[in-house]
């Protein structure tokens, strides 16, 4: 455990995403008053009190734009220092962590979808309201978001989207529903991708010590 904790600590300096990818399954990074195990210095694996619904999740990344990122993650973080909504965002994120932990325990996929999408859109809203401001989404991003929401309503399948700091869309859904969702992705969503390209990923077991 010390090896991975140290690896998470070191990788945090270069990448927050790497920091919270040292373990398989669900990882928690960031200090929170409700969770004694939490830390800003390294991530922690969460395995207790997590519904089996989240054991085998898929992530399909739709390549809407394959050009270089308009703004780096470090620059994006700096913009939050003077953003007029940053304090509200920090409080909201803190509350959402508590909500998420309850959702992970209950296995409520509908509430999971609502929270994930809210977080994604809030990130982009902050970038649009910063100074200088950035619109990271492309027109196709919004069309895909609308398609996913309509599909969820019509099919009653708990599939949702999240966004990175760019135009690409991550489609999240349980592995057990992959047959129906992958048909939707291939036949409809891939049409919005560069050369119909997308990356099909899944929850892994994390890196190995060598």
PLM regions and their residue ranges:
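Gly/Ser-rich oxyanion-binding loop with an adjacent helix/lid
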Residues: 1-56
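C-terminal nucleotide
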Residues: 49-210
């Amino acid at each position: 455990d010390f090896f991975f904790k140290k690896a998470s600590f070191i990788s945090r300096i270069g990448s927050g995403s790497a920091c919270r990818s040292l373990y398989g399954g669900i990882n928690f990074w960031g200090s929170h008053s409700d969770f004694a195990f939490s830390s800003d210095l390294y991530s922690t694996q969460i395995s207790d009190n997590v519904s089996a619904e989240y054991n085998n999740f898929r992530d399909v990344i739709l390549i809407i734009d394959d050009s270089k990122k308009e703004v780096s993650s470090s620059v994006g973080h700096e913009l939050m220092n003077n953003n007029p909504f940053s304090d509200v965002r920090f409080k909201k994120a803190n509350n959402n962590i508590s909500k998420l932990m309850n959702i992970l325990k209950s296995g409520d996929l509908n509430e999971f979808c609502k929270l994930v999408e809210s977080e994604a859109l809030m990130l982009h809203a902050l970038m649009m309201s910063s100074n200088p401001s950035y619109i990271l989404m492309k027109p196709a991003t919004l069309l895909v978001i609308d398609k996913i929401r309509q599909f969820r309503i019509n099919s009653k399948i708990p599939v949702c989207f999240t966004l990175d700091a760019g135009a690409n869309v991550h489609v999240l859904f349980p592995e057990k529903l992959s047959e129906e969702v992958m048909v939707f992705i291939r036949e409809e969503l891939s049409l919005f991708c560069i050369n119909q390209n997308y990356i099909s990923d899944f929850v892994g077991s994390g890196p190995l010590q060598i």
